[in-house]
Swiss-Prot record:
The lineage of its organism: Bacteria, Pseudomonadati, Pseudomonadota, Betaproteobacteria, Burkholderiales. Its main location: cytoplasm. It comes from Burkholderia mallei (strain ATCC 23344). GO terms for molecular function: ATP binding; metal ion binding; nucleoside diphosphate kinase activity. It holds the Pfam family NDK. It is an enzyme of class 2 (transferase). This is Nucleoside diphosphate kinase.
Length: 141
Protein backbone atom coordinates (compact mmCIF):
# COMPACT_ATOMS: atom_id res chain seq x y z
CA UNK A 1 0.00 0.00 0.00
CA UNK A 2 1.10 3.51 -0.74
CA UNK A 3 0.41 6.79 1.03
CA UNK A 4 -1.27 8.94 -1.61
CA UNK A 5 -3.00 12.25 -2.04
CA UNK A 6 -6.02 12.74 -4.25
CA UNK A 7 -8.23 15.65 -5.16
CA UNK A 8 -11.91 15.55 -4.31
CA UNK A 9 -14.54 18.08 -5.28
CA UNK A 10 -18.00 18.15 -3.77
CA UNK A 11 -19.98 19.52 -6.71
CA UNK A 12 -22.64 22.27 -6.69
CA UNK A 13 -25.57 19.83 -6.44
CA UNK A 14 -24.26 18.20 -3.25
CA UNK A 15 -23.21 21.55 -1.73
CA UNK A 16 -26.75 22.84 -2.35
CA UNK A 17 -28.17 19.76 -0.58
CA UNK A 18 -26.07 20.60 2.50
CA UNK A 19 -24.40 17.17 2.64
CA UNK A 20 -20.75 18.30 2.88
CA UNK A 21 -20.45 17.03 6.46
CA UNK A 22 -21.98 13.65 5.59
CA UNK A 23 -19.53 13.24 2.71
CA UNK A 24 -16.58 14.31 4.91
CA UNK A 25 -17.61 11.69 7.47
CA UNK A 26 -17.41 9.03 4.78
CA UNK A 27 -13.88 10.12 3.85
CA UNK A 28 -12.75 10.05 7.48
CA UNK A 29 -14.51 6.77 8.30
CA UNK A 30 -12.64 5.19 5.37
CA UNK A 31 -9.31 6.29 6.88
CA UNK A 32 -8.74 9.30 4.63
CA UNK A 33 -7.47 12.56 6.13
CA UNK A 34 -8.52 15.95 4.78
CA UNK A 35 -5.18 17.76 4.48
CA UNK A 36 -6.40 20.83 2.57
CA UNK A 37 -9.85 22.25 1.91
CA UNK A 38 -11.57 25.34 0.62
CA UNK A 39 -14.92 26.42 -0.73
CA UNK A 40 -14.96 28.22 -4.06
CA UNK A 41 -17.29 29.38 -6.79
CA UNK A 42 -15.33 28.43 -9.90
CA UNK A 43 -15.00 30.89 -12.75
CA UNK A 44 -15.76 29.68 -16.25
CA UNK A 45 -12.05 30.00 -17.10
CA UNK A 46 -10.99 27.86 -14.13
CA UNK A 47 -13.62 25.19 -14.84
CA UNK A 48 -12.62 25.06 -18.52
CA UNK A 49 -8.94 24.80 -17.61
CA UNK A 50 -9.53 22.13 -14.93
CA UNK A 51 -11.65 19.99 -17.27
CA UNK A 52 -9.57 20.75 -20.41
CA UNK A 53 -9.01 17.01 -20.92
CA UNK A 54 -12.71 16.82 -21.86
CA UNK A 55 -12.71 19.91 -24.14
CA UNK A 56 -13.50 17.93 -27.30
CA UNK A 57 -16.20 15.78 -25.67
CA UNK A 58 -19.87 16.56 -26.38
CA UNK A 59 -20.66 17.06 -22.68
CA UNK A 60 -17.89 19.64 -22.05
CA UNK A 61 -20.07 22.79 -22.15
CA UNK A 62 -22.74 21.24 -19.91
CA UNK A 63 -20.05 20.07 -17.46
CA UNK A 64 -18.50 23.53 -17.25
CA UNK A 65 -21.93 25.20 -16.92
CA UNK A 66 -22.81 22.83 -14.08
CA UNK A 67 -19.49 23.29 -12.26
CA UNK A 68 -19.92 27.09 -12.24
CA UNK A 69 -23.61 26.96 -11.25
CA UNK A 70 -22.85 27.26 -7.53
CA UNK A 71 -20.13 26.86 -4.92
CA UNK A 72 -18.04 23.71 -4.68
CA UNK A 73 -16.03 22.27 -1.81
CA UNK A 74 -12.51 21.29 -2.87
CA UNK A 75 -10.34 19.08 -0.70
CA UNK A 76 -7.16 17.04 -0.76
CA UNK A 77 -7.52 13.59 0.77
CA UNK A 78 -4.49 11.69 2.06
CA UNK A 79 -4.16 8.07 3.08
CA UNK A 80 -3.16 4.58 2.06
CA UNK A 81 -4.33 4.02 -1.53
CA UNK A 82 -6.32 7.27 -1.30
CA UNK A 83 -7.11 7.42 -5.02
CA UNK A 84 -8.74 4.00 -5.22
CA UNK A 85 -10.35 4.35 -1.79
CA UNK A 86 -11.97 7.64 -2.82
CA UNK A 87 -13.13 6.22 -6.16
CA UNK A 88 -14.73 3.30 -4.33
CA UNK A 89 -16.47 5.70 -1.92
CA UNK A 90 -17.77 7.80 -4.84
CA UNK A 91 -19.29 4.93 -6.81
CA UNK A 92 -20.02 4.78 -10.53
CA UNK A 93 -20.26 8.05 -12.48
CA UNK A 94 -23.92 7.31 -13.21
CA UNK A 95 -25.68 7.21 -9.82
CA UNK A 96 -28.22 4.73 -11.24
CA UNK A 97 -25.33 2.28 -11.67
CA UNK A 98 -23.57 3.16 -8.40
CA UNK A 99 -23.57 0.58 -5.63
CA UNK A 100 -25.88 1.23 -2.69
CA UNK A 101 -24.09 3.11 0.07
CA UNK A 102 -21.73 5.02 -2.23
CA UNK A 103 -21.71 8.82 -2.28
CA UNK A 104 -23.24 9.00 -5.74
CA UNK A 105 -25.93 6.40 -5.02
CA UNK A 106 -26.93 8.32 -1.90
CA UNK A 107 -26.55 11.97 -2.94
CA UNK A 108 -26.40 12.32 -6.76
CA UNK A 109 -29.36 12.99 -9.04
CA UNK A 110 -27.99 12.21 -12.48
CA UNK A 111 -24.88 11.38 -14.49
CA UNK A 112 -24.33 15.15 -14.83
CA UNK A 113 -25.25 16.24 -11.29
CA UNK A 114 -23.29 13.39 -9.72
CA UNK A 115 -22.23 15.00 -6.42
CA UNK A 116 -18.46 14.48 -6.47
CA UNK A 117 -15.28 14.48 -8.54
CA UNK A 118 -12.21 12.45 -7.70
CA UNK A 119 -8.82 12.02 -9.34
CA UNK A 120 -8.51 8.78 -11.31
CA UNK A 121 -4.75 8.12 -11.24
CA UNK A 122 -1.57 9.27 -9.46
CA UNK A 123 -0.54 11.57 -12.33
CA UNK A 124 -3.92 13.28 -12.53
CA UNK A 125 -4.10 13.51 -8.74
CA UNK A 126 -0.79 15.40 -8.64
CA UNK A 127 -1.89 17.79 -11.39
CA UNK A 128 -5.36 18.33 -9.92
CA UNK A 129 -4.07 18.97 -6.39
CA UNK A 130 -1.51 21.45 -7.77
CA UNK A 131 -4.26 23.20 -9.78
CA UNK A 132 -6.13 24.21 -6.62
CA UNK A 133 -3.55 24.07 -3.81
CA UNK A 134 0.06 25.29 -3.70
CA UNK A 135 2.13 22.73 -1.76
CA UNK A 136 2.50 25.15 1.15
CA UNK A 137 -1.28 24.97 1.70
CA UNK A 138 -1.43 21.17 2.12
CA UNK A 139 -0.78 19.87 5.62
CA UNK A 140 -0.04 16.19 6.28
CA UNK A 141 -1.11 15.18 9.76
Amino acid sequence: MALERTLSIIKPDAVAKNVIGQIYSRFENAGLKIVAARMAHLSRADAEKFYAVHAERPFFKDLVDFMISGPVMIQVLEGEDAILKNRDLMGATDPKKAEKGTIRADFADSIDANAVHGSDAPETARAEVAFFFPEMNVYSR
